[in-house]
Amino acid sequence: MFNKIFSWFENRLNPYPESNPTTPKKGLFRFIWSSITGMKGWIFLLAILTVGTGVMEAVLFQFMGTLVDWLGTFTPERLWQEKSHLLIGMAALLLISIVWGFLASAVHLQTLQGVFPMRLRWNFHRLMLGQSLSFYQDEFAGRVSAKVMQTALAVRDTVLTLANMFVYVLVYFITSGVVLVALDSWFLLPFITWIILFGLILRTLIPKLSKTAQRQADARSLMTGRITDAYSNIATVKLFSHGSREATYAKRSMQDFMVTVHAQMRLATSLDTLTYATNILLTLSTAILGIILWKNGQVGVGAIATATAMALRVNGLSRWIMWESARLFENIGTVNDGMNTLTKPHTIVDKPQASPLQVKQGEIKFNDITFAYDPTKPLLNHFNLTIKPGEKVGLIGRSGAGKSTIVNLLLRFYEAQQGEITIDGQNVLNVQQESLRRQIGLVTQDTSLLHRSVRDNIIYGRPNATDEEMVLAAERAEAADFIPFLSDSQGRKGYDAHVGERGVKLSGGQRQRIAIARVMLKDAPILLLDEATSALDSEVEVAIQESLDKMMENKTVIAIAHRLSTIAAMDRLIVLDKGQIVEQGTHAELLELNGLYAKLWNHQSGGFLSESAE
């Protein structure tokens, strides 16, 4: 029965809403308010339940004081005769408070505690997936993931602290004030004095804790980013024997983090000591005042018991308030830190009226394109290029000539400052990004695989592919000969073996063959090859070239290679220099022209451009 009740509360909120998330607004409260869309009703319900809990607890203290007076006045028989209805009513209230407390706990713990941060992580993660490549070039991947995880928890704790703790405390103190006035208004004096002193303590120390928490969140993000950076590039670290250097590099960020920890703990100790002192003052002053009022005949023993019990309750509450306040501002610091990243708008977005790209022929046009990574240094300046349907074009030029930039602009990883790029007459700015990239297959020299199984990496090209289609793609990519012999630390073998982060368990050639298999399985009408066979040895390259040739049939192809022999057979070669087309034609035509292409060809050593040519 209880499991069904728990399940009902647990299923009130969907942790994975299907609606597309919107970028949260800047500003602490605007950020939080826009992040909790879809959960506000349950948060409000929790606040209402908390109000009831605070009222019932204060009423219970008042009743216990009254009961003390009754016990000193009535005999047991007379007490039951005259006050039985009140005793039964209070017993009923206690039973109701149990159910009420269960509802408050169920809403808090079952409905909100776990689902709240997961829902935020789901939305934040999808927002980060929509960021451009330039965003990730400026950020540590580990730092971004840490902010997604930590900010979600911090938003939850901030909201629930306000809805639970602060609402409870506010209602409890208001109700207690009413009860104390009913006993004797003088009892308010020590409580008001305590509130003023405690408020001054919090006002003085909590802002300092907040600033320290902000510095600590920044230091934690930097520390996490540096550590993750070392792990992500562990091969480079070991290759240059810089383990100690990386440890020292991370240690500096750890030391900065510890400075913030010590500062935070000093403030915490001061806050704890001052709070304890004010609590002692409240308890003593309430007891002494109660005795004085009792001596003067103004109150009974029950009133003293009620006031003293409330003072002791405040004693316990104050430590809860103190640490929850400290945690609140620590969480606010974390939210502020994460907000700087999570509120960054997407720089490349689909237009509201964007339609899916329809590729029927595969004609590509670059019309008057001007683009620069640095606005002061244009890379492409009024660039024009038309690639006919089904044409195979090779891009050639020194490093920095703009070859990869042309590919990135076609994929809309970046957007040109001027001009337009069209595919079959459709401006890439006017089509949906996902549909654009679904129609393009890309193999690059920097092949990154997901830290998943070989199967998952290959079918990434076409998730609905059958196992037979996946294996056929692996065979065509000359990958089927080594995949059956792969294994991982969990005992998984072959296509089920995991390849490690970025495919680190595989050789460069193996990674590239799996990447080629993935693109072969995708079978997109437009194919981009950016040094697609650079990591393959000559024997494997010869074996795979036939499959690549077959894959290129009836497709529009743009290929980039420093090994000119691999693209010499293309329909047309485009020679770039400083973002401009300086030569174009077939291999034979360009050699006869005796220009830059001929110079690069003559400088080749072993099929690659030599350093002097670069």
From Swiss-Prot:
GO terms for cellular component: plasma membrane. Signal peptide: none annotated. Belongs to the ABC transporter superfamily. It comes from Haemophilus influenzae (strain ATCC 51907 / DSM 11121 / KW20 / Rd). It is a multi-pass membrane protein. ATP binds at residues 397-404. Residues 43-330 form the ABC transmembrane type-1 domain. Its main location: membrane. Residues 364-603 form the ABC transporter domain. One of its GO terms (molecular function) is ABC-type transporter activity. This is Uncharacterized ABC transporter ATP-binding protein HI_1051. Keywords: ATP-binding, Cell membrane, Membrane, Nucleotide-binding, Transmembrane, Transmembrane helix, Transport. It is found in: Cell membrane. The keyword Transmembrane helix applies. GO terms for biological process: transmembrane transport. The chain crosses the membrane at residues 41-61, 87-107, 157-177, 178-198. The keyword Nucleotidyltransferase does not apply.
